[in-house]
Amino acid sequence: MTVIDAKGLILGRLASSVAKQLLSGDEKVYIINAEKAIISGSRAATLREYRETRDRGATEFGPYFPKRPDRILKRTIRGMLPYKRARGRDAMSRLKVYVGVPYELKGAETTTIADADMRLLSSNKYVELGEVSQKMGSKF
């Protein structure tokens, strides 16, 4: 069981690292504090891109894109897995993503991913996933 704290981690780098970990092993991966993961880039451009992604298509026919930060993070990881095949579905079943810290993981030892740390950014342009989620209308 691996518990990863997403606070201050870059979304894409976190997602690719977790996807590799899920495909290579049999252990469960829990991600806590999903709303505190960051997306690098201009705040206005990032919010616009996520809004356009959410508004694409029709409400009856899809594509359906999540609003909540835990679901956005899980969808990002899903995009890096072969989720239509058995090994991808199996990998997704071992992943749990939470907003905040759930009761059962309060005392658990957390790890972080050094390659995904926000201190690696060359600029200070970023936005938290929770803020993106709130701008899309989420009430997490």
UniProtKB/Swiss-Prot annotation:
It comes from the Archaea. GO terms for molecular function: mRNA binding; structural constituent of ribosome. It holds the Pfam family Ribosomal_L13. Keywords: Ribonucleoprotein, Ribosomal protein. The keyword Transmembrane helix does not apply. One of its GO terms (biological process) is translation. GO terms for cellular component: cytosolic large ribosomal subunit. This protein is one of the early assembly proteins of the 50S ribosomal subunit, although it is not seen to bind rRNA by itself. It is important during the early stages of 50S assembly. Part of the 50S ribosomal subunit. Belongs to the universal ribosomal protein uL13 family. This is Large ribosomal subunit protein uL13. It comes from Methanosarcina mazei (strain ATCC BAA-159 / DSM 3647 / Goe1 / Go1 / JCM 11833 / OCM 88). The gene is rpl13.
